[in-house]
């Protein structure tokens, strides 16, 4: 990523959760430990099915008396509905602020040039009252600015950055093996732990129970992880969703995301594969 560029990620949506029971509510649902999320630290997490299958993933940022969830926009309405199903009588308010706030990405180098910035995944600080986060999944993916739409142009000028197409950012994310687009195609098809969430700092195996915890822990503790979500490159032709992948006539996986930045669930033929 170029130090002088900024990428407005219009594919991201924003939920804001607050209320008397908000910490307990999130802690009982998601894969990471919400107690770790502070004004200066944000984390990556996911919401799974009771069987441990993937549903949603997001970055959680502390904001005022609640939490911001930065999620793929095409999934935001479904995530909003799912959280409201779990809410029941909890004193929790869930707001969709996707039309008011946006997410913009800058390079790690630009982030570290800002005053008081630290080279730590998830490190969070304020820039003109807006949160800016060094990506908790992989700091090489740069930092994310969660900002009111009306303030975006002013901040871009003040930071002396050039706006570029988000495709450059997503291409780099694909190279790093982090799926951020068309993640709805993963729903109920793949275990959360197969999405590399442990490697992306998205699962805390020491926290208490959460939705899907039993299967996730079993796969981890019994060393049952034999498949992973990996980026693939199309050399020729076209990819189809659920298309099988072969190596020397042996089926090793299938395509799950077949769009511009494709991913496939790949089996390990070698247990020592890193």
Predicted regions, residues:
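Short amphipathic beta-strand starts and helix->beta connectors
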Residues: 1-2, 43-57, 87-88, 124-132, ...
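Acidic, proline/glycine-enriched N-terminal capping motif
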Residues: 1-57, 61-64
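Short, surface-exposed ligand-recognition loops at beta-strand->loop->(often short) alpha-helix junctions
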Residues: 16-21, 36, 106-111, 233-240
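Glycine-rich, small/acidic residue-mixed loop/short-helix segments
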Residues: 54, 193-203, 213, 217-274
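Acidic, low-complexity central loop/insert segments
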Residues: 5-9, 13-16, 59-176
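Glycine-centered loop/turn motifs
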Residues: 40-41, 116-126, 238-243, 274
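Short, intrinsically disordered, mixed-charge
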Residues: 27-35, 77, 81-89, 116, ...
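Anionic-ligand-binding alpha/beta catalytic cores of soluble enzymes and soluble regulatory domains
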Residues: 138-229
């Amino acid at each position: 990523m170029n130090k002088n560029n900024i990428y407005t990620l219009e594919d991201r949506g924003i939920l804001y959760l607050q209320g008397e029971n908000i910490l307990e509510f999130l802690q009982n649902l998601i894969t990471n430990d919400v107690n770790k999320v502070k004004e200066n630290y944000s984390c990556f997490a996911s919401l799974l099915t009771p069987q441990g299958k993937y549903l949603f993933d997001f970055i959680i940022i502390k904001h005022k008396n609640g939490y911001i969830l930065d999620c793929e926009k095409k999934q935001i309405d479904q995530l909003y509905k799912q959280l409201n199903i779990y809410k029941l009588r909890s004193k929790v308010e869930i707001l969709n602020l996707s039309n008011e706030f946006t997410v913009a990405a800058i390079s790690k180098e630009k982030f570290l040039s800002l005053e008081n910035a630290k080279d730590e995944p998830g490190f969070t600080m304020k820039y003109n009252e807006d949160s800016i986060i060094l990506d908790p999944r992989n700091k090489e993916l740069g930092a994310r600015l969660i900002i009111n739409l009306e303030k975006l142009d002013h901040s871009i000028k003040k930071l002396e950055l050039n706006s570029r197409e988000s495709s450059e950012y997503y291409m780099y994310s694909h190279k790093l093996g982090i799926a951020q687009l068309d993640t709805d195609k993963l729903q109920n098809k793949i275990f959360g732990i197969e999405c590399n969430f442990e490697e992306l700092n998205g699962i805390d195996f020491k926290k208490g129970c959460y939705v899907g915890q039993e299967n996730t822990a079993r796969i981890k503790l019994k060393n049952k992880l034999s498949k992973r979500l990996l980026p693939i490159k199309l050399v020729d032709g076209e990819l189809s969703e659920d298309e099988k992948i072969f190596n020397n006539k042996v089926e090793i996986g299938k395509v799950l995301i077949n769009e511009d930045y494709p991913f496939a669930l790949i089996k390990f033929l070698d247990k020592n594969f890193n």
